[in-house]
């Protein structure tokens, strides 16, 4: 059997990225320096094996590829979740997300992290 273990993304400001993902509901695990001199932080969502690895490198400029689509998280109550994020100062898009939820079965919204990575939010029961 094969398991999806983690996703690594490069970040320009480790503390800003950690703070952003903590606001999304991730929990911070280990932080360490790699042998190559990178700073690493490991974040996870409770109940998930898959984790997010943030990597800051003194020798690398972060540039999110234009064609990188997004990662996605699932929440039980997307309206309450998005309200919480907006109250914390995180922009939810598209801008009319609340109106879009009044019709159709699929409820989704997006946020953008400090480096430009998109995170899709889907309602899942």
Feature map (PLM): residue ranges:
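Core segments of cupin and vicinal oxygen chelate
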Residues: 1-2, 8-49
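Vicinal oxygen chelate
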Residues: 3-13, 31-32, 41-44, 61-125, ...
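Generic beta-structure capping elements
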Residues: 46, 55-57, 124
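Arg/Lys-rich, alpha-helical DNA-contact motif
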Residues: 48-52, 63
